[in-house]
């Protein structure tokens, strides 16, 4: 079996790359009305979760995601709050996060895995974990914010594009 630490290394790299792509966008220009209009109702989200997980894992993911799911007007308020504080948040995140390529280099120098292939996975395998990571815990993350903003699919595509982290 794969070492938990090795999986965490690869997952951390993927999330750092996702954060970089997210932080390159101008959240302050988000069309909140369009994001709210495009927001799926809970039954559609549940169908998506159940198509991502099987059995008891699906039940767990549904329960966890329902905790953080926002109805349209709640979503409008949440997005507005995030946008209002975005410059401070963006500045803090930019200071705290290590660039993905720098972290990959640090891992390599330490003899740790820095590419999915180092632990017998592919970039496609790692990509497939993104919705699972978003749905499996009730904690609100950048993946959730990206989904609410309508950017999730585009950002995942950018992370795993030909000029992405693992090319």
Regions found by a protein language model. Name each.
Residues 1-23:
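A conserved active-site cap/scaffold subdomain adjacent to cofactor or substrate pockets
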